[in-house]
Amino acid sequence: MPGTNDFRSYVFDPARVDAAGKNVGQRVYWKLYAIENLVRVMAHSILTAQVGANWWAVAVDPGIQASVQRRRADYTNRPWHGTPGKHDIYYAFLSDLSKIIIANSHLFRPVIPDIDQWIARLEQVRLPRNIVGHMNWPHKTDRQRIDVVHADLQQLVQQLAASGTGLSIP
């Protein structure tokens, strides 16, 4: 929707709230969805190859494991809701994913030599992700940052696939 602006800059109008929500969803939210899930697939694939199928128990900080178990329990205790996924990685936040990659960067480096730059880039979208995830309007610079990280991550995934790195869905 070209010309849609943050509804909070105007006199209240429910139609503006709807338009702003549609704009953020169509322009930004889906890219964050893709970023987080591509990172999950890459982390799972690389750590499975480097550590083994039990990589979560071996390579993830116990604090993150405990947080994920609490989140998983929230869903288990409310079985009438859908769940994020079967693997624990789907219960990890973007900040958790970054910490997992940081702690295991030596295992990522053979496959993604510039992993430190990727960690920094994920950190650049963490706060804008929270803004969008909590249904607020991102700043133009944040939208551009998300656009660039999304496009570059798509390229990285294509490069990994072309290099023979097996990418598998957790």
Question: Over which residues does each language-model region extend?
Answer:
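Amphipathic alpha-helical interface elements
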Residues: 1-170
